[in-house]
Each structure stands twice: as C-alpha cells, then as structure tokens.
C-alpha cells in the first residue's frame, strides 16, 4: 500500500475497515488505555478518538496494533513480504562483491534506488502552518495520555526524536518516551547506547556549556516511524529507507529555531534543547515488561516552539504486559531480522522473538547444525550481530527439526537434548536494559545461552537417541481409510 503521509494512511486504513473512529467521549487519562488494550488483544482496528474531553485534538492509537498494519505501513500487503525488506537491508548492509560484469550490472538498480531516495528538502511545510512560541508554548494543550494508575505524569510515547552530534552531517532518529514536567518541559528518557544519547554525549564533550538542539515529531508518516525502529545500515539514512518503503522521497523541512530537519507532513513538531547538567527524575511508569519501572534521572527537554498542521492529530500508544503495540511491532520486525541474520549465518533456518518475552529478551533460533559447538557460535552471533539484540537475555538454539515458534517443540528439545551443566552458557557483566529490575546492577547483568541441539561426537560420550517416527507407508494406509473409522 502506497501513501503520502499519516492522514493518507489513515484514510486508506478506514477504507479497508482497518481503522475505527470513536466519537464517544473517551479520556486520555487511563480510559484510552483500557479501550485500546481491549481492541488490540482482539486483533481489532486502529482507533481515532475524535471526542477527547478538555482537548481540541483527536488521538490516534493502535496504529500498528496488528502485524497486517505494520506490513501496510512498510508498503507491503502481508507479513510474508517483510522478508523481502529484510533481504533488501541485508544486501545494503553487507553487499556481496559482484561475480562478474553481468552480476554487477544487475546490482545497479538496487543501489540506484537507494541513492535516489535521498530526502527532498522543502520550505513552507504543512507542519509549520501554525507556530506557538514563547508564552504560547503549552504542552498541556496536547492530549498526552496517562496510561496506568501508577504513572507519575502524562507521557509522550510516540515521539520521534531528531538529533545530530557535532561534526556529523547525518541526523539520528529515535523513539524515546518523554514525561510531561510543565507547559514547556519534558524529560527525555533515552538509554546510554541509543543514538540520541550518544549524540548528546559527544556534544557535551565538544561544547560542554552549550545547549543541545532537539526536535520531536508527533504524528509522522508510518514509513518514517518504522524506519526509526528498523536496523537500517549505517550507510543509509532512516529518511532514505523510509523513502524506499513509501516509494517516494521523504520530504523534510528545516526547523524554525535550529538546523535540524523534520518530516514536512508531520502533525506536530516540538523544537527545543537540552541544557547540560539539567536532569530530573523520570518515572515510575508502567512499561512493556508489565511492571512499573524504577525512577532514574534523565535530561530535561525545554520546548521553545510548537508547530503543527491545520487540525493536528496526536499519535499515541500505551505499553504494558504483552501483547501491546511494541510487541506486535516486534513480531513484524522479526521477519525483517531473519534475512539479515541468514546473510551472515546461512545455517540459521528460523529466528523467533516470542512477544511474551517482551519482544527482545528471549530468542529461539533453529539451525542446520554442522559441527560440534555450532550452537554456541550462534548464541554469540545473536548477541553481537545487531544492536537490537544487545539486551536479549536468553538464546535457545535448536535443530531444524524443531519449530522455533511452537513452545511444545522447543520445550521438548530443551528437556531431551540438554544437560544443564554442559549445554548452558553464562555470560556475566553484559549490557542489560535499564528497565530490567531483575539484573543485580542497573544496566548490567548476565546472559544465558541454551544449546538444545542434538549432540555430536565430541560433545557427548553416549549414544544419542533417535527421534521416534512412524513408517510413511503405514501412515498413508491409515490415512486412506481414516474416514471409514467414524472418528473426527
């Protein structure tokens, strides 16, 4: 599905009955979470709340509440096609050297397509139709959700944050939640390894007393949002990748008050800065783990300016115990990850991040095992290959006769092919999600790899068990007269 901006995407979803307008008054304080959660768990449509009490702005939730809608946002019609996007990223990330002139010529369209999707810079953008400055700036006029009863304050959840480090031409995009502090202040919660935090750290080293420019987009088009959460190669900007997904170049415009660029079709843009040394305690908030996170200090984002379109739409979500919207995104992006992994490790048959594992904390990998110790190599590969797997605590490796997406298969393999001492790998003092309160130190913890593959000579001194299977001829004969037995 091709679309020009968020509003076009909404219109097309509505025409397919994949989006529902809610005209009944629903409050962004807790009530929208209840409605959105019930609809998401039933596989229902995206929701546009048009009657938000005390606010003059509609709220969009559950935009990516099904895998189908994630695929549509990536310009595809089904989750199966997301593997092709993964293959595209794999080709751009690790291009194979051409085998000859004909092969080199065949690769040109892909490279040319990527190069031709560089952003298009425009002026007079629709996202700057209205401008609030100085005393006009009032974040409390936005229908920012309070998602859970124990949340300390309203929370921006779909803020697309643009930053740029010193001496860098490329801008970084990331999605970081932001706690409302006052009419013009938010808390920018980003983890230390994320692009925005790294840009800010580099800025403070270069300009220790100067303000760090930041722009936050609320209501970007789906391709731009999804590009920000996809493992785009460093050689390709997120905006260029968004253009590839959308089938047309991303239109960007320069912020009014700094040199950063934002999507021209964005619904709302917040312009401002971080002041070195200015931090505030953030949280607690209900999170994608299903728990409230602990309170930690993060930089304060001072908003100098708010720009927006005519009749802007506020894009929001909630996070909680899976399934939630991030979990659905994780299931879809799982299909993108597989070709990236297989490009480097072709012995991988399947890779699965179960949503109940908080989308990234546990991975199941099936392989065509080729030598003793092979499973341990794959564990290390998962932990080190993509930044997205830095916080994966558990990796279970199985043979290719196991369905990675079937817990009955996986548990059978673990309980019959594993010796806890021999087949468990523990790695200590590794990076761990700050939200993982189970780790002994904030941001630092251990990882466990489990080898649930059949063991080869050299890995065991015992004769290995042979799986029980029925004779094919007997199966076919019984299936032939099954209908005559009076059984279902």
Curated annotation (Swiss-Prot):
For the ligand (Mn(2+)), the binding residues are 172, 238
* A biological process term (GO) from this entry: ubiquinone biosynthetic process
Signal peptide interval: none
Catalysed reaction equations from the record: a 4-hydroxy-3-(all-trans-polyprenyl)benzoate + H(+) = a 2-(all-trans-polyprenyl)phenol + CO2
Per UniProt, the keywords (alphabetical) are: Cell membrane, Decarboxylase, Flavoprotein, FMN, Lyase, Manganese, Membrane, Metal-binding, Ubiquinone biosynthesis
Q: Entry's InterPro entries?
A: UbiD, UbiD-like_C, UbiD-like_N, UbiD_bacteria, UbiD_Rift_dom
What this protein needs as a cofactor is: prenylated FMN; Mn(2+)
Superkingdom, according to UniProt?
Answer: Bacteria
| GO (cellular component) term, any one | plasma membrane
Q: What does the entry's cofactor note say about binding and number?
A: Binds 1 prenylated FMN per subunit.
One Pfam annotation, family name?
Answer: UbiD_N
Q: Which GO terms describe its molecular function?
A: 3-octaprenyl-4-hydroxybenzoate carboxy-lyase activity; metal ion binding
Query: Which positions bind prenylated FMN?
Result: 175-177, 189-191, 194-195
Subunit (UniProt): Homohexamer.
Checking NCBIfam families in the record gives: PRK10922.1, UbiD family decarboxylase
Name of the protein described by the UniProt record: 3-octaprenyl-4-hydroxybenzoate carboxy-lyase
Native source species: Legionella pneumophila (strain Corby)
Corresponding gene? ubiD
């Amino acid at each position: 599905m091709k679309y020009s901006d968020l509003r076009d995407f909404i219109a097309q979803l509505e025409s397919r009955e994949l989006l529902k307008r809610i005209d009944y008054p629903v409050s962004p304080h807790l009530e929208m979470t209840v409605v959105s959660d019930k609809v998401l768990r039933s596989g229902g449509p995206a929701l546009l709340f048009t009657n938000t009490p005390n606010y003059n702005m509609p709220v969009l939730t559950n935009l990516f509440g099904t895998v189908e809608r994630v695929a549509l946002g990536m310009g595809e019609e089904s989750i199966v096609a997301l593997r092709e996007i993964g293959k595209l990223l794999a080709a751009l990330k690790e291009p194979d050297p051409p085998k000859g002139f004909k092969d080199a010529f065949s690769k040109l369209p892909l490279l040319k397509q990527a190069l031709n999707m560089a952003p298009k810079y425009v002026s007079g953008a629709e996202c700057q139709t209205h401008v609030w400055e100085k005393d006009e700036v009032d974040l409390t006029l936005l229908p920012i959700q309070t998602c859970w009863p124990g949340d300390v304050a309203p929370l921006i959840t779909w803020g697309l944050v643009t930053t740029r480090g010193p001496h860098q031409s490329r801008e970084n995009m990331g999605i970081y939640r932001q706690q409302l502090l006052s009419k013009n202040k938010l808390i920018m919660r980003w983890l230390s390894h994320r692009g925005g935090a790294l840009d800010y750290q580099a800025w403070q080293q270069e300009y220790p007393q100067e303000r760090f420019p930041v722009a936050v987009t609320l209501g970007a088009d789906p391709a731009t949002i999804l590009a920000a959460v996809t493992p785009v190669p460093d050689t390709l900007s997120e905006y260029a990748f968004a253009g590839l997904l959308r089938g047309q170049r991303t239109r960007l415009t320069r912020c009014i008050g700094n040199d950063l660029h934002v999507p021209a079709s964005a619904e709302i843009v917040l312009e401002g800065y971080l002041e070195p040394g200015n931090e505030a305690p953030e949280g607690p908030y209900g999170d994608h783990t299903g728990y409230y996170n602990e309170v930690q200090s993060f930089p304060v984002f001072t908003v100098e300016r708010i720009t927006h379109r005519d009749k802007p739409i506020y894009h929001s979500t909630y996070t909680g115990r899976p399934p939630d919207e991030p979990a659905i995104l994780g299931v879809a992006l799982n299909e993108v990850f597989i070709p990236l992994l297989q490009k480097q490790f072709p012995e991988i048959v399947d890779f699965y991040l179960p949503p109940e594992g908080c989308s990234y904390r546990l991975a199941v990998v099936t392989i065509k095992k080729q030598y003793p110790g092979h499973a341990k190599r794959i564990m290390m590969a998962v932990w080190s290959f993509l930044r997205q797997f830095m916080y994966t605590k558990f990796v279970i490796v199985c043979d290719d006769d196991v369905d990675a997406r079937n817990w009955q298969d996986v548990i059978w393999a673990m309980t019959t092919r594993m010796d806890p001492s021999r087949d468990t790998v523990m790695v200590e003092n590794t990076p761990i999600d700050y939200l993982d309160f189970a780790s002994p130190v904030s941001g630092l913890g251990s990882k466990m790899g489990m080898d649930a593959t059949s063991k080869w000579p050299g890995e065991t001194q015992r004769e290995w068990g042979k799986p029980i299977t029925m004779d094919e001829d007997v199966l076919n004969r019984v299936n032939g007269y099954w209908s005559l037995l009076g059984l279902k």
